[in-house]
Amino acid sequence: MSEIKQQDNQVFEAITKEFERQDHHIELIASENFVSKAVMEAQGSVLTNKYAEGYPHRRYYGGCEFVDIVEDLARDRIKELFGAEHVNVQPHSGSQANMAVYRVALKPGDTVLGMNLSHGGHLTHGSSVNFSGVDYNFVAYGVDKETEKIDYDVVRELAREHKPALIIAGASAYSRIIDFEEFKAIADEVGAKLMVDMAHIAGLVAAGLHPNPVPHADFVTTTTHKTLRGPRGGMIICKEEYAKAIDKMIFPGIQGGPLMHVIAAKAVAFGEALTADFKAYQQQVVLNAKTLADALTEKGLRIVSGGTDNHVMSIDVTSFNITGKVAERALDDVGITTNKNTIPFDKESPFVTSGIRIGTPAVTTRGFNEEDMKEIASIIADVLAHPEDENVKHDAKVRVRAITEKYPLYK
């Protein structure tokens, strides 16, 4: 980064400090990960200079013959990974991917069935403060109060009652396997289209560790970071019958020129996802998550739904007589990064919460193993039991640094 330091020392210092934070902290935010050096190099390449409105071999600008190669590679690799009929890799984010699907599949005011945000859904699945909840009539399904798992019978009853035009499966804080085949059966019964937002689990699906929604859904959206371990961005997979409509909705519908440097980074990440190493990585992600959940349970913390089948879990911190807000701050003080998160049937506000959400993609990328998960669980329990005790927090900082120093970032 010598050029940045010479040109703009303020930005250089901020980047340097952020690198130190990432290197010295244990990153447990479930939606974060560490991309490879190759992905970063692609995103910082000369492709950032190129405008390429349109699609490969159908551009509105000249000089696109090489960026066409990159976008074709990205699309072909996704087709191979997921068995997709059609792919659009141009969405700048998962939210824009979702917006494009809504505008293709729905008319303003149409009814949509999606997962309640407070039960593990996503902002773009009908939150009243999001465009989705403003433009469409969302009806929410949630989890069963006892099992804290999706009750497909209730989903079916809601679908029969409200006759949605679109049903959305997928979540941002749901730790169990989602039955896409059952969602498809429900959608077919009521004449709805099915969209799956697999942003959190795309890497697990690619590795064969979670059922693939592509054969069942009309549309599948995802981010390209998180478990897929690519650059920040979005993507849409759809049936061939919707291909032209989806492409037209992305460009010129809601976006202009694609970010070709990001698409290059996506292509590199998708290539990595096709390797045996990537599958082994995802297996370790799941193993680490299960180990961490079990160890936290042994320490007296309650995991929502009783455990995890994937990379993520929500922890109910009320048994320690604290809020999610307090837990997030106390853990951050010692170098463990999490996020406060509502849990099903939460009595606290989204700004306070009764839980925190944690995940294992980032720490697994660094090389953390099951023994590290047990130590992390012990640190978390100690800190949450004594969130204001400076002696406990000092000891926790030392233990955190001992772990992170074993796995230096980008070294």
Curated annotation (Swiss-Prot):
<comment type="pathway">
    <text>Amino-acid biosynthesis; glycine biosynthesis; glycine from L-serine: step 1/1.</text>
</comment>
<feature type="binding site">
    <location>
        <begin position="121"/>
        <end position="123"/>
    </location>
    <ligand>
        <name>(6S)-5,6,7,8-tetrahydrofolate</name>
    </ligand>
</feature>
<dbReference type="InterPro" id="IPR049943">
    <property type="entry name" value="Ser_HO-MeTrfase-like"/>
</dbReference>
<keyword id="KW-0808">Transferase</keyword>
<keyword id="KW-0028">Amino-acid biosynthesis</keyword>
<dbReference type="GO" id="GO:0004372">
    <property type="term" value="F:glycine hydroxymethyltransferase activity"/>
</dbReference>
<dbReference type="GO" id="GO:0035999">
    <property type="term" value="P:tetrahydrofolate interconversion"/>
</dbReference>
<feature type="modified residue" description="N6-(pyridoxal phosphate)lysine">
    <location>
        <position position="226"/>
    </location>
</feature>
<dbReference type="GO" id="GO:0019264">
    <property type="term" value="P:glycine biosynthetic process from serine"/>
</dbReference>
<protein>
    <recommendedName>
        <fullName>Serine hydroxymethyltransferase</fullName>
        <ecNumber>2.1.2.1</ecNumber>
    </recommendedName>
</protein>
<feature type="site" description="Plays an important role in substrate specificity">
    <location>
        <position position="225"/>
    </location>
</feature>
<dbReference type="GO" id="GO:0030170">
    <property type="term" value="F:pyridoxal phosphate binding"/>
</dbReference>
<dbReference type="InterPro" id="IPR019798">
    <property type="entry name" value="Ser_HO-MeTrfase_PLP_BS"/>
</dbReference>
<dbReference type="InterPro" id="IPR039429">
    <property type="entry name" value="SHMT-like_dom"/>
</dbReference>
<comment type="pathway">
    <text>One-carbon metabolism; tetrahydrofolate interconversion.</text>
</comment>
<dbReference type="Pfam" id="PF00464">
    <property type="entry name" value="SHMT"/>
</dbReference>
<keyword id="KW-0963">Cytoplasm</keyword>
<comment type="subunit">
    <text>Homodimer.</text>
</comment>
<keyword id="KW-0554">One-carbon metabolism</keyword>
<feature type="binding site">
    <location>
        <begin position="349"/>
        <end position="351"/>
    </location>
    <ligand>
        <name>(6S)-5,6,7,8-tetrahydrofolate</name>
    </ligand>
</feature>
<comment type="function">
    <text>Catalyzes the reversible interconversion of serine and glycine with tetrahydrofolate (THF) serving as the one-carbon carrier. This reaction serves as the major source of one-carbon groups required for the biosynthesis of purines, thymidylate, methionine, and other important biomolecules. Also exhibits THF-independent aldolase activity toward beta-hydroxyamino acids, producing glycine and aldehydes, via a retro-aldol mechanism.</text>
</comment>
<dbReference type="InterPro" id="IPR015421">
    <property type="entry name" value="PyrdxlP-dep_Trfase_major"/>
</dbReference>
<feature type="binding site">
    <location>
        <position position="117"/>
    </location>
    <ligand>
        <name>(6S)-5,6,7,8-tetrahydrofolate</name>
    </ligand>
</feature>
<dbReference type="InterPro" id="IPR015424">
    <property type="entry name" value="PyrdxlP-dep_Trfase"/>
</dbReference>
<dbReference type="InterPro" id="IPR001085">
    <property type="entry name" value="Ser_HO-MeTrfase"/>
</dbReference>
<keyword id="KW-0663">Pyridoxal phosphate</keyword>
<dbReference type="InterPro" id="IPR015422">
    <property type="entry name" value="PyrdxlP-dep_Trfase_small"/>
</dbReference>
<comment type="similarity">
    <text>Belongs to the SHMT family.</text>
</comment>
<dbReference type="GO" id="GO:0005829">
    <property type="term" value="C:cytosol"/>
</dbReference>
<feature type="binding site">
    <location>
        <position position="241"/>
    </location>
    <ligand>
        <name>(6S)-5,6,7,8-tetrahydrofolate</name>
    </ligand>
</feature>
